[in-house]
Structure formats: structure tokens, C-alpha cells
């Protein structure tokens, strides 16, 4: 059984946390994140350590306890280090460009796809076929990267499309001739 909720969250240097009516605000060198948590879970801040306590050991409380701890830890990591997801484009003529805060993708359609960067998200292009999505919120970084990938998901026959770096795409064999 998982005991993630019982682990102590250690705050790195430069990270401050405040809790008011279970609305937690985490401030760090990269920015500030605020999130409301369940009233059932008690969040205690003691110096540079944060502990979470549940009122009883019911199944619902255990699940909320672990989830709350994971979300809070992601907030702490986000404001201190940040998160990033890398995507790569494979295909003839597939490339990306930046126009201000807008990502413009040429992925074999009759028109270019434009993706506006949500608040707190930055796009970087180390080369025209690699996209780096970075920010302080793990949730928003993941959703933005998934949206960019969904514009041209990798297809199983030639492997063309937008994929995460290191993602394995299952390939299929094409039709065989007579």
C-alpha cells in the first residue's frame, strides 16, 4: 500500500509556503502558485518542513491524503526548479517557428497551426524540429504539451508526427503486394 501522504515535504531554500483555510500559496524564485485543497486534510508548516494529516483511515481519506501531498510537492518543485516537456517533430517539411509568444507549426496541413502560450508557459525551439514547453505548473505544462502533440499525433505506419522525446511509437507493417 502506498504511503506517499505520510512523507514530509522539505522546502528548498528560497521557497515560502502559506496556508489560510486550506488555500495554499507557494512562493519561490520562479514564481507563485496557489491552490485550494480539501478541508479534511490538515496541512502543517513547521519551519522548512510541511506535513499533512488525515482525520481517519477511511479509503477516501487515504486517497485524498496521498493526492494532496503529491500536488503540494509538485507546487514546491515547480516554483523552485520548474517543469519542462520536450517534443520532437518527425516528417518531411514538419517544423516549428516562434512568433512572439505564439508557436506556429507546419505539420503537413493546408494551413499552419498556431498555439498561443497559456499564462506561465514558455515555448523554446533549440532547433526547428524540437519544441520545449516549460513553466512552473506541472499540470499546465503537461496539458500544453499534450495539446501540441494532439495537433499531429505520431501515426503507426511511417512514424510521422509530433511525439515526446523518448516516446516509443508502435509501428505497423503496411499492406503487402501480390
Swiss-Prot record:
One of its GO terms (biological process) is cytoplasmic translation. It comes from the Bacteria. GO terms for cellular component: cytosolic large ribosomal subunit. InterPro entries: Ribosomal_uL6-like, Ribosomal_uL6-like_a/b-dom_sf, Ribosomal_uL6_a/b-dom, Ribosomal_uL6_bac-type, Ribosomal_uL6_CS. The keyword Ribosomal protein applies. GO terms for molecular function: rRNA binding; structural constituent of ribosome. Keywords: Ribonucleoprotein, Ribosomal protein, RNA-binding, rRNA-binding. The keyword Ribonucleoprotein applies. Part of the 50S ribosomal subunit. HAMAP family: Ribosomal_uL6_B. Belongs to the universal ribosomal protein uL6 family. This protein binds to the 23S rRNA, and is important in its secondary structure. It is located near the subunit interface in the base of the L7/L12 stalk, and near the tRNA binding site of the peptidyltransferase center. This is Large ribosomal subunit protein uL6. It comes from Streptococcus sanguinis (strain SK36). The lineage of its organism: Bacteria, Bacillati, Bacillota, Bacilli, Lactobacillales.
Amino acid at each position: 500500500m502506498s504511503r506517499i501522504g505520510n512523507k514530509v515535504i522539505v522546502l528548498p531554500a528560497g521557497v515560502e509556503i502559506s496556508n489560510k483555510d486550506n488555500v495554499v500559496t507557494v512562493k519561490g524564485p520562479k514564481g507563485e502558485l496557489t491552490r485550494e485543497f480539501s478541508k479534511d486534510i490538515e496541512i502543517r508548516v513547521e519551519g522548512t518542513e510541511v506535513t499533512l494529516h488525515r482525520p481517519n483511515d477511511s479509503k477516501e481519506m487515504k486517497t485524498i491524503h496521498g493526492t494532496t501531498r503529491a500536488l503540494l510537492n509538485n507546487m514546491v518543485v515547480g516554483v523552485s526548479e520548474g517543469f519542462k516537456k520536450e517534443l520532437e517533430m518527425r516528417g518531411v517539411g514538419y517544423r516549428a517557428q516562434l512568433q512572439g509568444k505564439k508557436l506556429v507549426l507546419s505539420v503537413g496541413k493546408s494551413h499552419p497551426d498556431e498555439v498561443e502560450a497559456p499564462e506561465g508557459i514558455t515555448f523554446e525551439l533549440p532547433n526547428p524540429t524540437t519544441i520545449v514547453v516549460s513553466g512552473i505548473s506541472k499540470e499546465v505544462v503537461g496539458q500544453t504539451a499534450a495539446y501540441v502533440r494532439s495537433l499531429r499525433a505520431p501515426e503507426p505506419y511511417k512514424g510521422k508526427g509530433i511525439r515526446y522525446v523518448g516516446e516509443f511509437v508502435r509501428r505497423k507493417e503496411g499492406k503487402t503486394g501480390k
